[in-house]
Amino acid sequence: YHSADYGKTFTRIADDSKVWGFALSIKQDPTEPNLVFLGTEFGLYVSFDKAKTWNKWEHGYPKAVSTYDMTIQEREADLVIGTFGRAIYVLDDIRPLRAFAKNGGKAPVGKITAFPAPDAYQAEIQQPHGERFMASAKYAGENRVFGGRLSYLIQDEKEKLDSLTVKIYTASGEQIRTLKTLPSKGVNRIIWNLDRKSSAEMTGGWGGGQGGGIHLRHLRQV
């Protein structure tokens, strides 16, 4: 239920006609109030219109699992979900969902829309000693990929794109990387490894990384 008058009256926002299973948890986005997440006995739901309508979320999430608790990690804009029997799930970077909610559940205008990218950090990971061949003795979830995550929306229904070019610039305007990918309709995500474009002067070894002040400046369809 939802109250807009400090508890004097309540409006039911979820029932059997809208969601499947008992409601167990609910979380409203502190940045975009129209974006609301609902956890039920049988899955996760998302609303882009302040709980008026619900959409079942099944992208990388179990179709039927008790969704007991949720919180939003505001620095990373991640939705962290606690389930019963299926461990913890993290929905990385909900900024694209905020854009939909801000627009009343509709996609932003334009064939291609680039969403604000989260901060990315360069890190060198070393495997700890004694954990090389663990077989089935170790249970661990899969971490998200390293690098910069760039999200964009394709909503052209008539024309299918052969490829998409992403150009990355420094704060001073220097182009340092060009990425190409095969996009599909809807929200897409490409990972940049925080490296510069190759140089003919480099003769070997590992390529150097890139420091701060990086901006996604240009998307071009081909």
Regions found by a protein language model. Give the residues of each.
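Short, glycine-anchored, charge-dense loop/turn motifs used at functional sites
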Residues: 170-174, 222
